[in-house]
Swiss-Prot record:
It comes from Caenorhabditis elegans. Signal peptide: none annotated. LRR repeats lie at residues 6-31, 32-54, 56-77, 78-102, 103-126, 128-148, 149-172, 174-195, 197-221, 222-244, 246-267, 268-290, 292-315, 316-338, 339-361, 363-384. GO terms for molecular function: actin filament binding; phosphatidylinositol-4,5-bisphosphate binding. This is Protein flightless-1 homolog. The gene is fli-1.
Length: 1257
């Protein structure tokens, strides 16, 4: 149904819609008064026929479409002023020739098409002021075009195949902009340019310009403001350019200029200078005189530190500075004085450091420094350091060192930057001066305000006192008057003749009125005494006294369920009736079921109550519309949740997505089995906000997975509780993108309406695009919203309501598309979700302690005391745990074995523990569990005072204790521990009673006392003991012997039999069984490979381990061969798969450190693992920081939280910065280690690295 508003539409922007095929709205032909129309990016294949009926159309845009021809319809538009059809598929034959004869045609844009020649009859468009033929394949320009179009102001012929221009171009004396870039123009000498005295823009990039074909008379063109001679291989800057006084923008990039020979006083008005991709080594000093310069591009040159003027800080208007791809090692200090600098690019240089003031630039948004390998950033000052606070934790290096008890020395760079007192810089002093001046000014103004208010208050108090005295005198002078006389005196003379008849109350009788639509309505006497409980009534009883005077009694009766307006109007009209009758009686209120005796006697004490109401209310009654169940497909775009409406059917479901089913009382979140859990969680949060804002918390939110959907879900979706028979299949196309949103603004004028679009950068709408005085329409194709501002006038609101109805009907939409009305301040959640960042969630600081939340008296004290969350990073600043010397290790081993009396070994076979043969003592398997029973002597306590009183025969007896060590291999299951606790441990407890201690240990996490009992002969093999003994030993095996921090921790562990597992810092054993027994009876060989950097004192133990443990009990006929690194034979490398690159740098052994970052204590804390760490110390619940001396790695566990990851990243940066400050430490790189894909630089720090264990669940 048409609203009749289309005939008043003056212009509309349909850009971004899909008008392919026959989808163009036919209602456009009703817009007979339309003067402008935009159809950009609308997938048009031909000019719509409806345009031929828009005879008043003046401006038409059809850019970015698929037009092949514009014949027919354009010729029917006699008033056409501008034709913009760029970026189509037009050819010369597809352009009608008669449109150029239109007298009013002024703008012609045919760029980015397939034109090979200038359209026919173009020379007849004599009124044209804009002609754009760029990005075509035009080879020549007819002479007649330049001869006739003498009124042109803008001419763009760039990106064609022009070799020359007609000489008649000199007739374009009014031309202001000429763009000829990317044309050969071999035969165009620019001799005609001086005749174009109005020319202000000249673009001739990549047009084969040389010093010969640039005329010196170019300096006569005083109006030139924008010149582009880039990509022309010019050796120097043309001399004529230096004389252009009004030049604002100059582009000379892509040439071969080696020197910029400018002098002082030239280019004083220049704002943009582009000298990129040249061969400059120096920027002239007079560049700093260009005080209006805002953008300077000098990338891809040969600039050094000496080539940048030291006074560059004088360019106070500079906002963009590009110095990428040069040879800069330093940059002048003056750059930090360019206070308006917003973008600074210094990438791909040789920078060592930057000026300290770089952190003080207030407007700097982009600082590109990548590909500067040796760059060391200066420390941040105090003001900038505050921005390092993350989750209320200050991660600045100085603050963390201070907490750790290591204050920076006065000579350090940090101390010099943050020192106060006399060493404050000029900026800090200026800030302090401004603060004092402002405080002083505020104090003076405050004193003046207080004085003025005091005077006003004094005068006011005096006046008030006089008025009170005057009123008291008047009251004393007044005599007591009757209240009836007061009523008569103050009675308002209001005419009630239109409400009450003249004969009302003129004689004895009773009148009853019912309140209907704010006014009393007289009732017939037959209905007297019948009252509806939802109505209100007015009753008048008039009697004649003996004196002949009339006496009136006025009542107003209120039903129990009467509406507010009826009760109010009955009271008001009762007073009006009394004034109408000039009565002196009171109006008496009567309520249902509480009537007075006087009122009941009027009806013979018989009153009938009737349920309901007989009259209508004067108020508008609102009827809540029935809820429309809708289905939305949820998607995540960054942090925003996008809800795309889909048809309400099972066929809309897709197992890869999450869906929100809004059924009114219940909101369902349905998740497909292939959907992402993050999308489901965000959809749930969206439903929570939808319920809170739109439903006031009255809806229930339910979630269900595809595999288990309750009948209630299917009932809400299909109307049937049974699960549909058909399968839910993937049907949404890959890479599906929802249709672009369009935001219209409704404009109204004298007799016309306009509907332009608001430009959405990158298709993103923001809340600040809406204005309180305006009316906007948001069109997302499947939904259309009308938003009305609070201050919008009534006519604009009405126009918006009618236009949104027409817009909904005109454009082809799905059947489930709906129109919604939104009011400013009361927007629905679905409307808000269409705008980026529109979320009114109350910000909550979850890092605040409960005490600080409960305390409210002094907010400043709370903020000052609790603004920093507790964090413990002290471990990062401690020195690395020193390695134990060989002598100390020997002494520790001796002490640990001193009290050992007995050691029995057991191994789990099947479900029982059996005694381990003595020849296998010290050999472990990764899939087995072992039990060691150790008996220790306990020395008796000596009596210090009564030592001499004991006789020699009375020596105290030696006591003992038993420690049971349970050792579990890395690949063993927990069943071994369960068997031990239920079988063997009870027997030990029964025997040893309270003298028993059980210690459970895991592979490579043994304590020193346990390791000391094996005296460095500790071998760990892969696999299971029984299986390996029977079937193993027939293939080569490689073992690595390694001691971390102490020789007590010496372990020999089997690794992959590959050459890249070798390391020059350790000894290795390579066991090679022969296929056939040699003549000398040897069945194999064991190579003991000595790394060049290995400890010579460990070589003897390597030989013992090889002969006692690596050689099997039945392989005594294996010969042992000692090999020094670099002296290997061919057999050695052949068994290892050929000679390959292995780790030869042993320095990492002295630097390896492993830190654990966790929140398990209730706050963020970092602790350091012992030097003897292993792969299983990498906890999937936490974040780890590993330092190998060359790089600092951040390793993220599979189950760690996002907060832990963010805090650990900041802490790792603090550690990285602290190591850089140490004089004896070499610089380290900051790298990320991805779990399961760790690099060899990371893995080499762990003894016998193997496959990562997958976390449970």
């Amino acid at each position: 149904m048409s609203t009749g508003v289309l005939q008043f539409v003056k212009g509309i922007d349909f850009s971004g819609n899909d008008f392919s095929g026959d989808r163009f709205p036919h209602d456009v032909e009703q817009m007979t008064q339309m003067t402008w129309l935009k159809l950009n990016d609308s997938k048009l294949e031909q000019v719509p026929d409806e345009l031929s009926r828009c005879a008043n159309l003046e401006h038409l845009q059809m850019a970015h479409n698929q037009l092949i021809s514009v014949h027919g319809e354009l010729s029917d538009l006699p008033r056409l002023r501008s034709v913009i059809v760029r970026d189509n598929n037009l050819k010369t034959a597809g352009i009608p020739t008669d449109i150029f004869r239109m007298k009013d045609l002024t703008i012609i844009d045919l760029s980015r098409n397939q034109l090979r020649e200038v359209p026919t009859n173009l020379e007849y468009a004599k009124g044209s002021i804009v002609l754009n033929l760029s990005y075509n394949n035009i080879e020549t320009i007819p002479n007649s075009v330049c001869a006739n179009l003498i009124d042109l102001l803008f001419l763009d012929l760039s990106n064609n195949k022009l070799d020359m221009l007609p000489p008649q171009i000199r007739r374009l004396s009014m031309l202001q902009s000429l763009k000829l870039s990317n044309n050969p123009l071999n035969h165009f000498q620019l001799k005609q340019l001086p005749s174009m005295t109005s020319l202000s823009v000249l673009h001739m990039s990549n047009t084969n310009r040389t010093l010969d074909n640039i005329p010196p008379t170019l300096d006569d063109m005083h109006n030139l403001r924008d010149v582009d001679f880039s990509e022309n291989n010019l050796p120097i800057v043309p001399e004529a350019l230096f004389k252009l006084r009004n030049l604002r923008k100059l582009n000379l990039s892509g040439n071969k200029i080696e020197k910029l020979n400018m002098t002082e006083g030239e280019w004083e008005n220049l704002e943009t200078l582009n000298m990129s991709h040249n061969q400059l080594t120096v920027l002239p000093d007079c560049v700093v005189k260009l005080t209006r310069l805002t953008k300077l591009y000098a990338a891809n040159n040969q600039l050094t530190f000496e080539g940048i003027p030291s006074g560059i800080g004088k360019l106070i208007q500079l906002t963009v500075l590009h110095l990428s791809y040069n040879k800069l090692e330093l940059v002048p200090e003056g750059i930090s004085r360019c206070v308006k600098l917003q973008k600074l690019k210094l990438d791909h240089n040789r920078l060592i450091t930057l000026p300290e003031g770089i952190h003080l630039l207030p407007d700097l948004k982009v600082l590109d420094l990548h590909e500067n390998e040796n760059l060391v950033m200066p420390p941040k000052p105090n003001d900038a350091r505050k921005k390092l606070a993350f989750y209320n934790i200050d991660f600045s290096l100085e603050h963390q060192r201070k907490i750790a008890g290591q204050m920076t020395s006065p000579s350090s760079s940090i101390s010099s930057v943050h020192s106060g007192g006399a060493r404050q810089d000029a900026l800090a002093r200026r800030k302090e001066f401004i603060r004092r001046r402002k405080q002083q000014a505020d104090q003076q103004s405050a004193d003046k305000v207080i004085q003025g208010m005091s005077k006003i208050a004094g005068v006011g108090a005096a006046l008030t006192e006089k008025q009170q005295e005057e009123e008291e005198r008047q009251l004393e002078a007044k005599s007591a008057v009757n209240w009836k006389k007061n009523i008569e005196k103050n009675r308002r003379h209001i005419d009630y003749s239109d409400i009450f008849d003249e004969d009302v109350g003129s004689d004895e009788g009773m009148w009853v009125w019912e309140i209907e639509n704010f006014y009393p309505s007289i009732m017939d006497e037959a209905f007297h005494g019948q009252f509806y409980d939802a109505d209100a009534y007015l009753v008048l009883k008039t009697t004649r006294e003996a004196s002949g005077q009339l006496r009136h009694a006025i009542f107003y009766w209120l039903g129990e369920h009467a509406s507010l307006d009826k009760g109010m109007c009955s009271a008001v009209h009762a007073v009006g009736l009394r004034n109408h009758l000039n009565a002196t009686c009171r109006t008496q209120r009567e309520e249902m079921n509480d009537e007075t005796e006087e009122f009941l006697t009027l009806f013979g004490e018989e009153i009938v109550y009737i349920e309901g109401g007989r009259t209508i209310s004067g108020f508008y009654t609102t009827e809540k519309p029935a809820h429309l169940t809708r289905l939305y497909r949820a998607g995540v775009n960054g942090t925003a949740v996008e809800m795309e409406p889909v048809p309400l059917s099972v066929e809309s479901l897709d197992p890869r997505f999450c869906f929100l089913l809004d059924a009114g009382e219940t909101i369902w979140i349905w998740s497909g089995y292939k959907s992402r859990i993050t999308v489901s969680n965000k959809a749930r949060l969206f439903a929570e906000r939808l319920n809170k804002r739109d439903r006031k918390g009255k809806s229930e939110i339910e979630t269900c997975r595809q595999a288990r959907c309750p009948p209630e879900f299917w009932q809400a979706l299909t109307g049937n509780p049974d699960k549909p028979q058909g399968a839910i299949v993937e049907h949404v196309p890959e890479g599906f993108v929802a249709e672009r949103k369009k935001l219209y603004k409704v404009n109204i004028g004298m007799g016309f309406l306009e509907l332009p679009q608001v430009e959405l950068p990158k298709g993103i709408a923001k809340q600040d695009m809406l204005g309180s005085k305006g009316v906007f329409v948001l069109d997302s194709n499947s939904d259309i919203f009308l938003w009305i501002g609070k201050k919008a006038n009534r006519l604009l609101k009405m126009a918006g309501q009618k236009l949104v109805v027409e817009l909904h009907q005109m454009i082809d939409r799905p059947d489930y598309a709906q129109v919604y009305r939104e009011t400013e301040g009361e927007e629905s959640m679905m409307f808000r979700s269409k705008f980026a960042g529109w979320d009114e969630i109350v910000p909550v600081d979850y890092t605040r302690t409960s005490d600080s939340v409960q305390r409210v008296p002094d907010l400043k004290v709370i903020v000052k005391k609790d603004n920093m969350m507790r964090a413990d990073l002290a471990a990062l600043f401690l020195e690395r745990q020193p390695s134990m010397s060989y002598e100390e290790s020997e002494e520790l081993m001796e002490d640990c074995n001193y009290d050992l009396e007995l050691m029995e070994s057991f191994v789990l076979e099947g479900k029982k523990f059996v005694k381990l043969p003595q020849k296998e003592f010290g050999i472990f398997y990764t899939m087995d569990c072992y039990v060691f029973l150790c008996r220790y002597a306990v020395m008796p306590e000596e009596d210090e005072e009564g030592e001499d009183e004991h006789d020699e025969d009375d020596k105290p007896e030696m006591d003992f204790k038993c420690v049971v060590y349970f050792w579990q291999g890395r690949d063993a299951s927990n069943m071994g521990w369960l068997n031990f606790t239920f079988q063997l441990q009870p027997n030990f407890e029964e025997i040893f009673k309270d003298k028993l201690e059980v210690v459970r240990m895991y592979q490579q996490q043994e304590n020193h006392k346990f390791l000391s009992h094996f005296k460095r002969k500790f071998l760990i093999k892969r696999g299971r003991r029984g299986l390996t003994k029977n079937l193993g030993g027939k293939w080569p095996e490689l073992f690595q012997m390694r001691a971390n921090g102490s020789s007590v921790c010496n372990r020999t562990i089997q690794v992959d039999c590959q050459a890249n597992q070798l390391c020059s810092a350790f000894c290795h054993m390579l066991r090679i069984p022969f296929k056939e027994i040699e003549e000398d009876g040897h069945r194999g060989v064991v190579y003991v490979w000595m790394g060049k950097d290995s400890d010579p004192r460990e070589h003897e133990f390597a030989r013992q381990v090889a002969s006692d443990l690596v050689v099997r009990d039945d392989d005594n006929d294996f010969r042992i061969v000692e090999v020094q690194e670099g002296e290997e034979n061919e057999e050695f490398w052949k068994v290892l798969g050929g000679k390959k690159k292995y780790e030869t740098d042993s320095s990492f052994v002295k630097h390896t450190r492993l830190f654990r970052c966790t929140n398990e204590k209730g706050y963020f804390a970092i602790s350091e693992k012992t030097v003897d760490f292993c792969q299983d110390d990498l906890d999937d619940d936490d974040i780890m920081i590993l330092d190998n001396g060359d790089a600092v790695f951040l390793w993220i566990g599979a189950r760690s939280s996002d907060i832990e990851a963010k805090l650990s990243y900041q802490a790792a940066q603090v550690y990285h910065a602290s190591m850089r400050m140490k004089a004896n430490e070499k610089p380290r790189k900051f790298m990320l280690a991805v779990r399961g894909r760790e690099s060899c630089r990371f893995r080499k720090c762990f003894h016998a690295w193997s496959k990562m264990k997958e976390p449970m669940g």
